[in-house]
C-alpha cells in the first residue's frame, strides 16, 4: 500500500515535461484567430470517458457559446461521435458557423480546410485532425493570401457604447 499500487516497472519510468504548442493552438494560429475569445477542448474518445459525460460537455459548450476544439474526433472503429457532436452544437448555433479541419499539424502533409458546421463531412476527418467549431460570433474572411477565421472579443461593442455608460447598461437601453 505504501507504493500506491504502482509497479516496479512504472516507478522506473522517467517523466519529462517540456513546454510546447498544443494542436488546438497551432490550428488557431495557422488559420487566423478562432481562439480569440472563450473556448474549450473536448475529447470525443469514449474509451475512458462515458459518452453520456462527453455529450453533457458538448451541451455545456454549446449553451455557453464557446469555440470548441474537438480532439480524438474519430477512429477506425469510432465514427459516430463527431456527427453526434455536430448535431448537438447545431441546437445552439447556426449551421453556418465556421469550422476548421486542421490535419497533420507540423508535419510535411499539414492541411487546413475550412467548412461550416452544417457542411461538416465526417469522412474528411481522421485521428490526426483537430476539429475547431466556431462560436456564433466567429467569422471567416477570404483574404488575398487565403482564408482566415477569427472570433472577436467584443471590444467593438465597448467602443461603440455611449460615453459614460457600461456595456450592460447600454444593452439594457436598447
What are these regions (language model features)?
Residues 63-174:
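A contiguous loop/helix-start segment that scaffolds small-molecule binding in enzyme catalytic cores
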Residues 1-64:
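Class I SAM-dependent methyltransferase SAM-binding "motif I" and its flanking Rossmann-like core
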Amino acid at each position: 500500500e505504501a507504493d500506491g499500487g504502482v509497479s516496479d516497472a512504472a516507478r522506473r519510468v522517467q517523466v519529462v515535461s517540456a513546454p510546447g504548442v498544443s494542436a488546438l493552438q497551432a490550428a488557431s494560429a495557422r488559420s487566423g484567430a478562432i481562439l480569440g475569445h472563450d473556448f474549450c477542448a473536448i475529447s470525443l474518445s469514449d474509451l475512458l470517458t462515458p459518452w453520456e459525460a462527453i455529450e453533457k460537455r458538448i451541451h455545456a459548450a454549446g449553451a455557453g457559446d464557446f469555440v470548441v476544439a474537438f480532439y480524438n474526433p474519430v477512429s477506425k472503429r469510432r465514427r459516430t461521435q463527431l456527427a453526434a457532436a455536430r448535431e448537438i452544437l447545431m441546437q445552439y448555433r447556426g449551421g453556418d458557423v465556421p469550422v476548421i479541419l486542421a490535419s497533420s499539424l507540423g508535419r510535411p502533409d499539414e492541411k487546413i480546410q475550412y467548412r461550416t458546421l452544417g457542411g461538416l463531412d465526417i469522412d474528411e476527418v481522421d485521428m490526426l485532425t483537430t476539429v475547431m467549431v466556431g462560436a456564433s460570433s466567429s467569422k471567416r474572411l477570404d483574404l488575398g493570401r487565403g482564408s482566415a477565421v477569427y472570433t472577436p472579443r467584443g471590444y467593438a461593442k465597448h467602443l461603440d457604447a455611449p460615453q459614460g455608460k457600461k456595456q450592460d447598461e447600454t444593452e439594457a437601453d436598447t
